[in-house]
Amino acid sequence: MYALKRELWCVLLLCGAICTSPSQETHRRLRRGVRSYRVTCRDEKTQMIYQQHQSWLRPLLRGNRVEHCWCNDGQTQCHSVPVKSCSEPRCFNGGTCLQAIYFSDFVCQCPVGFIGRQCEIDARATCYEDQGITYRGTWSTTESGAECVNWNTSGLASMPYNGRRPDAVKLGLGNHNYCRNPDKDSKPWCYIFKAEKYSPDFCSTPACTKEKEECYTGKGLDYRGTRSLTMSGAFCLPWNSLVLMGKIYTAWNSNAQTLGLGKHNYCRNPDGDTQPWCHVLKDHKLTWEYCDLPQCVTCGLRQYKEPQFRIKGGLYADITSHPWQAAIFVKNRRSPGERFLCGGILISSCWVLSAAHCFQERFPPHHVRVVLGRTYRLVPGEEEQAFEVEKYIVHKEFDDDTYDNDIALLQLKSDSLTCAQESDAVRTVCLPEANLQLPDWTECELSGYGKHEASSPFYSERLKEAHVRLYPSSRCTSKHLFNKTITNNMLCAGDTRSGGDNANLHDACQGDSGGPLVCMKGNHMTLVGVISWGLGCGQKDVPGVYTKVTNYLNWIRDNTRP
């Protein structure tokens, strides 16, 4: 009888259809305490597990067709279906999205090196960095030698981390059994089935070897590297050299071990000087010199805190997640006090970047104040730093009609050569390289104290963050923005998640102007855009428009030179 049904089914699919013989293995597991068998199918081509009667597409491209498969009594049955390009991006890492013409399923055609339903798995990753939170490789063996269980396994439904969580893709979980670290543990792990129960186990995934970075942070008090050359090119003397007898900082100092001194000639900063130094002989005379040692790049680093509260247009955030965010205030003209004006971006100790349109009223510089390190817009923070403004520079070619060249610089006032002091709440963002090219649909972040929605009469009381994707230039045109002028100095980004008109789409809004659009480059957050303008807030398929920072690197450099 089954054979007859099978034959009839194939006849019905003769018009361009392809019948795939069910050669996949049937997996049956008795769930304890339940008198029924869970029937699943494993797709041998993708290694994904599917439940009884579940259907899916798989990327077996034949012209403009893919295969539509479903799980029937433990066997995978497939036939080809026509597809079209997806109406919205759903694939990561440059994958091509194809959607079935007659139903809503989609499939991603992944570039070389990436696999997974949405190309979210990096098959080339052979080790994990730091704690492995961003590890997306394919290691699936634990330290005990056990094989990891698929995160989609029904037995994990009651576990805190499984492949069916709403944020599964973000955490790296899904229909696979690869090691992950979704809870920010010390290293990647997975669930295993042992002694009739599921339990977590650390994976044997190798950690990436870290090259010792020859640079110093702060004043270099903790520098323990091996650099031994000074700025003049002289070689350092060993700290235990007899020539140093009578000097305070030598290998014979009672605190030598704590200070990093010993039987070596490596640069150190035992006395709290401005940077590491060492003793040298110059013209047969004993002296000292600063070392030829660069300061570590700390721009774009942060202590990211996972947002706990979702609000209209984004998520509430802590300033330590966006320590380059500035709040710009201006004195009221006809009443005492000040009002919030715009956002800004700390790009160096004494310079803040913002949007030109924020300063169309040409306020006197001494009426403007910049606050750094503040989570709540109007409530002083414990680590905040406030500055008066020496001057601000609006781009000479700013067009207040089209918002072309919508960029401005503010110089912070200080009695010394430095202004903002680096901390967890205050840090510069990295400026991009001139040739920076990020892939289309790269996920980036913006932050600001702006309104939750366009109709709101109030700005947000707390800093917000939003997650958006970079639009390709072909989708950042006047045609896609109701015939508004788009120039080469602008870029577009928006929330591309599916949903109806009432979906909570992330976006910038009034009051966020001048704030940052940042993307991860390496392990540093890099500034790619300045929040400029948009049509409404959080409208589906309507991106926000940002000033393209790479076009202004020379302008920034020329105007911030001492």
Swiss-Prot record:
The keyword Secreted applies. Belongs to the peptidase S1 family. The active site is at 357 (charge relay system), 406 (charge relay system), 513 (charge relay system). This is Tissue-type plasminogen activator. GO terms for cellular component: extracellular space. Disulfide bonds join 41-71, 69-78, 86-97, 91-108, 110-119, 127-208, 148-190, 179-203, 215-296, 236-278, 267-291, 299-430, 342-358, 350-419, 444-519, 476-492, 509-537. It comes from the Eukaryota. Residues 20-32, 33-35 form a propeptide. Residues 126-208, 214-296 form the Kringle domain.
